[in-house]
Regions:
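Short beta-strand-to-loop capping motifs
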Residues: 70, 163-167, 192-194
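Structural preference for beta-strand elements that scaffold enzyme active sites
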Residues: 29-31, 50, 160, 180, ...
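Structural motif of enzymes handling amino- and sulfur-group chemistry
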Residues: 91-148
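Conserved PLP-binding catalytic core of the aspartate aminotransferase-like
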Residues: 134-177, 183-184
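PLP-dependent enzyme catalytic core of the Aspartate aminotransferase-like
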Residues: 173-210
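Active-site PLP attachment segment
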Residues: 47-93
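Active-site phosphate-binding strand-loop segment of PLP-dependent enzymes
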Residues: 1-35
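Short, glycine/acidic-enriched loop or turn micro-motifs at the edges of active sites
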Residues: 36-37, 57
């Protein structure tokens, strides 16, 4: 069962408990994409058989750095089909072939790193590792609810706030005001993170009503 912890277009948070329960009834594995969650919403990778996560979203790292986690149950059943030299038990003995001994751990799924991306990722991930992500979520989703209140729409309790904007009129107003937002699946999508505050909520409201 493959799902995104946070849906990209709407910011809706998946009901992980229900998904895990349904998967267990059918003896199915679960794979959770945490790309739209890690860095703003607490994520416990131990709940799932696999998680995948790119770091260029809420973790604010350069493109090219990503993570995979595997449960012991799933790890025991998987073998990479196109393993590169970095998946070898001894990477420096795995450069030229023709034979290679795969790493016995999940490192056998590693690929050759995008070196420059990981230099940047080390700094940003280090920053987030020192934060209380529950507090980050409380702050970001609180700003999202403040925007909902100001716009007169139901609170969504999310860091990503979205509403119907099929014509793109609202998005155009925000862009014209110098506010970065996006249009996804016929909806306007606005989000809040560490560097946002109440003044940003007011800026969005002013631009939409101007």
């Amino acid at each position: 069962v493959v799902f995104s912890l946070v849906q990209s277009a709407t910011g809706t948070i998946a009901d992980t408990g229900a998904i895990i329960e349904a998967a267990a009834r059918h003896d199915a594995f679960t794979l959770c994409d945490a790309t739209q969650a890690a860095g703003v919403l607490p994520v416990d990778a131990r709940l799932f058989d696999a998680t995948v996560c790119h770091t260029y979203k809420w973790l604010c790292a350069p493109r090219g750095a990503a993570f995979l986690t595997l449960s012991e149950r799933l790890d025991a059943q998987l073998t990479p089909l196109q393993a590169g030299w970095y998946a070898g038990d001894d990477v420096w003995q795995s450069c030229y072939g023709p034979a290679m001994q795969l790493a016995p751990s999940a490192r056998r799924f590693d690929v050759s790193p995008a070196w420059q991306a990981w230099i940047g990722a080390e700094q940003s991930i280090g920053l987030f590792a020192g934060l209380d992500i529950a507090e980050v979520w409380e702050r970001a989703s609180g700003l999202g609810d403040a925007l909902c209140d100001a716009l007169g729409i139901p609170q969504q309790h999310q860091a990503i706030v979205s509403w119907p904007d099929a014509s793109g009129q609202d998005l155009g107003k925000l862009i014209a005001a110098g506010i970065r937002a996006s249009g996804r699946a016929g909806r306007l999508r606005a989000s809040f993170h560490l560097w946002n505050d109440e003044s940003d909520v007011q800026s969005v409201v002013t631009a939409l009503r101007g």
